[in-house]
A protein has these predicted regions:
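Long, compositionally biased intrinsically disordered terminal regions
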Residues: 17, 29-33, 56, 60-61, ...
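Broad hydrophobic/π-residue packing in well-ordered secondary structure
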Residues: 4-5, 23, 27, 41-43, ...
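Active-site proximal loops enriched in glycine and acidic residues that flank catalytic Cys/His/Asp
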Residues: 12-15, 45, 98, 107, ...
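Cysteine-based protein phosphatase catalytic domain of the PTP/DSP
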Residues: 1-85, 112
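A phosphate-binding catalytic loop at a beta-strand-loop-alpha-helix junction
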Residues: 90-109
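Classical protein tyrosine phosphatase
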Residues: 10, 104-109, 115-117
């Protein structure tokens, strides 16, 4: 399999014990079996590392991926021109169990690092500065990302995203944790008492589309 100059890093955020360990182990097995030199698996037990609302430990994940964030770069091109200034050289594929809440938090971190590199390249922010060094820019980024995460979550699970206080404010809060409890209960209710009807409707719609 030839992927040219592209590389992939799979960021696996599932628990490394309990029922999720089996899923993570299967992913490990598949990656090892395929033995592709342009694919790397980076396991990070999100719930273990960030327990007790200590989400500053996400810096560990950032350090694990920082060299590849730089290596993969970003795409940039002149307006009305086919000339490219930069070509992206790789991708991050992030997953948890449903690729929603933990995934959204990790991807927001990756996106912020990439945004920093792009703005630094364009000399909009200085070298060595972080996006959070500019309060208005940081607030806008967090709001856009959190709103997008909430919308994706509503389509998939019927509620806003869990852990949204981190993506929206950059830290975990007790009000955010309480809101997570409400959303988790709402998801449980929908999953057991409402989503069955929706799934049947989708199945019928797909069947009609086939015929």
């Amino acid at each position: 399999m030839n992927m040219g100059h592209f590389k992939f890093v799979i960021v696996n955020l599932v628990n490394q014990k309990g029922r999720e360990k089996r899923v993570g182990g299967e992913l490990d097995r598949v990656v090892l079996r395929t033995n592709l030199d342009f694919v790397r698996l980076n396991a990070f037990d999100f719930h273990k590392e960030c327990r007790t609302l200590d989400w500053g430990r996400l810096d560990m994940l950032k350090k694990q991926l920082r060299s590849e964030i730089t290596e993969f770069g970003f795409f940039s091109s002149f307006i009305n021109s086919t000339e490219h200034m930069h070509k992206q050289k790789g991708f991050f594929r992030t997953n948890c169990m449903d690729c929603l809440d933990r995934t959204n938090v990790a991807q927001s971190m990756l996106a912020k690092e990439s945004l920093k590199d792009q703005l630094s390249y364009m000399k909009i922010i200085g070298n060595g500065f972080e996006v959070d060094s500019y309060p208005e820019l940081s607030a806008t980024f967090k709001r856009i990302w959190a709103d997008n995460g909430d919308e994706c979550s509503r389509q998939y699970a019927g509620t806003g995203a869990l852990k949204a206080d981190y993506t929206r404010f950059g830290k975990r809060t007790f009000s955010g944790a309480w809101n997570d409890c409400i959303n988790a209960f709402t998801r449980y209710f929908r999953n057991n008492f409402a989503d069955g009807y929706r799934q049947v409707t989708l199945n019928i719609s797909r069947l009609c589309a086939i015929f």
